[in-house]
A protein has these predicted regions:
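Conserved PLP-enzyme active-site core in the AAT-like
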Residues: 4-174
Length: 174
């Protein structure tokens, strides 16, 4: 039932409001229909292909702010799907707030080969977004895998449960 779904979602993510959709593409369509207008700029860490398609369909600009190391297939890093905080901050500083309706952080970063994003990077991305008054949206298609990588690769999270890590992740989302 709807009420069991609501209870489960709130218990996992800590968020009381949600809109069920049958797939990620539909969710993107709903949210971008409400948030974007022609000419807007949507920064992110390598937008997934359907995400980029929904943004560009609305005559907006999907801007990649992924760390440069994500493109180096020979370099091994524990978190290679991260937002480049300096690139994001530069974009937000150089564009009017009304032209940037949101920032999209994809966890894990599918376009960069399913690379995870650290909790530190999620937190820093959220801090920058809040400083500029821009909502942070999480593309959460693979949130559980990302939480697992945080648990196994990031200092300070080995003793936390996946649920605790997920709850922390979503404290940074809008």
């Amino acid at each position: 039932s709807y009420f069991r779904l609501k209870e489960t979602i709130e218990s996992i993510f800590g968020m009381p409001y949600f809109l069920p959709t049958h797939q990620g593409r539909a969710a993107e369509n709903v949210i971008f229909s409400a948030l974007l207008k022609a000419g807007d700029i949507v920064p992110g860490n390598s937008h997934f292909d359907t995400t980029k398609g929904h943004i560009e369909f609305r005559r907006c600009h999907a801007v990649d702010c992924t760390i440069d190391d994500a493109a180096d297939t020979q370099k091994e890093l524990p978190f290679k799907g991260e937002m480049d905080i300096a690139k994001l901050e530069k974009l937000l500083r150089e564009n009017p707030r009304e032209k940037v309706p949101c920032v999209v952080l994809t966890i894990t970063n599918n376009t960069a080969g399913g690379q995870p994003v650290s909790m530190r990077n999620i937190r820093e991305t959220a801090e920058v977004c809040r400083r500029y008054g821009v909502p942070l949206l999480l593309d959460s298609a693979r949130f559980a895998e990302n939480a697992y990588f945080i648990k196994t690769r990031e200092e300070g999270y080995a003793d936390k449960t996946i649920k605790e890590i997920v709850r922390e992740i979503y404290t940074y989302a809008d």
